[in-house]
Regions:
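Bacterial N-terminal signal peptides that target proteins for export
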Residues: 1-11
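Subset of outer-membrane beta-barrel
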Residues: 27-324
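Sec/Tat signal peptide C-region and signal peptidase I cleavage site
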Residues: 21-26
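Bacterial N-terminal signal peptides
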Residues: 10-20
Length: 324
């Protein structure tokens, strides 16, 4: 494929993803600069797409050191542990995820288990996935400062928690070593907990946040640079009220070293680097804020390992779409 054709394909990819131009704002759903490494969490359709058991640990410290007026550290932190593997007897793959997301005085722990059915489309694979999730959300309302001390919504509330069930659905399509495209919905039910207080004037409750994800990427190589793999990709995350766009580009040298940059629309520029030694990959990114509010930068580190499996399948010479 010549350079002109490659560039045209990349342009089409980004136009498709960003054609629905909604104003980008901050939102509650967890965000990752290394979003290409957390496919299985955001899209159950990806489960089992690669030839092995993949385990990922990802930790993000957003706005590191940010505090409130009382000196309490309220910067968001997110830890994700996920894994997926092919499951031939079920014609697809399985995935699990455990995530803790802390934002100020709010703490969320999410556990998920999912399955993806793989359809062979002749040269490409479509994964159709569903995952059930349990979310435990807790908030220490006693630490919140209301504009009105007698705010009826906060009357009788202290440190409250509730458990909610929801599920995710996803489609993930990939052409080996060529193109991938995914669309998913997280928290389809948008579940609501029982009332947290008995206030007759106003009651408070927790809800899960229905979030839509789209992701696409196009790994390719130039004939004159066979030792380099370029991976442009883009993602959209939206809960309708707010939308976030990411666009990134990576270069991978000899399948060992990777370097890249990520732009999160109207929020940050992320610098990314990674190294792969056999089946172990370590990745790091640093986000430089562009909001102009004096917010500190964000750190993210990921560690992943692939346990190779002999699945007695017809040999296929391609790599996973995971690129650190």
């Amino acid at each position: 494929m010549d350079l002109k054709t490659k560039i045209s394909h990349i342009a089409i990819l980004f136009v498709l993803l960003f054609s629905a131009g909604i104003e980008a704002k901050a939102q509650q759903a967890p965000i990752f600069t290394n979003y290409a490494n957390s496919f299985a969490y955001a899209n159950a359709g990806f489960a089992g797409m690669s030839e092995g058991i993949n385990v990922l640990g990802l930790y993000r410290m957003q706005w590191a050191g940010f505090t409130d007026m009382d000196g309490n550290e309220i910067a968001p932190t997110t830890f994700l542990l996920s894994g997926d593997m092919p499951f031939r007897k079920l014609h697809g793959g399985m995935e699990f995820s455990i995530m803790q997301d802390k934002l100020g005085f709010e703490n969320n722990v999410n556990v998920g288990l999912g399955y993806s059915y793989h359809m062979d489309l002749g040269g490409s694979t479509l994964g159709i996935g569903v995952a059930g999730t349990l979310l435990n959300r807790s908030v220490d309302f006693s630490q919140l400062h209301a504009n009105q001390e007698s705010d009826p919504l906060l009357v009788g509330l202290g440190e409250e928690s509730a458990m909610m069930f929801d599920f995710n659905v996803g489609l993930f399509w990939q052409i080996p070593d060529s193109f991938f495209l995914g669309f998913s919905v997280v928290n389809v039910l948008e579940s609501m907990s029982e009332a947290l207080n008995d206030n007759s004037e106003s009651s408070a409750s927790f809800t899960t946040d229905r979030t839509f994800y789209a992701i696409a990427g196009y790994p390719f190589q130039f004939e004159d640079l066979p030792y380099l793999t370029f991976v442009p990709s883009a993602s959209v995350m939206s809960d309708i009220a707010s939308t976030q766009f990411n666009i990134s580009a990576r270069a991978i040298y000899n399948n060992v070293f990777s370097f890249g940059v990520n732009y999160r629309f109207q929020e940050s520029v992320g610098l990314m680097a990674g190294i792969t030694i056999k089946d172990l990959t370590v990745a790091y990114s640093y986000d430089i804020n562009t909001l102009g509010l004096g917010l500190p930068g964000s750190h993210e580190i990921g560690l992943s390992y692939c346990f190779k499996l002999d699945l007695d399948r017809t040999p296929r010479d391609y790599r996973s779409v995971r690129y650190l």
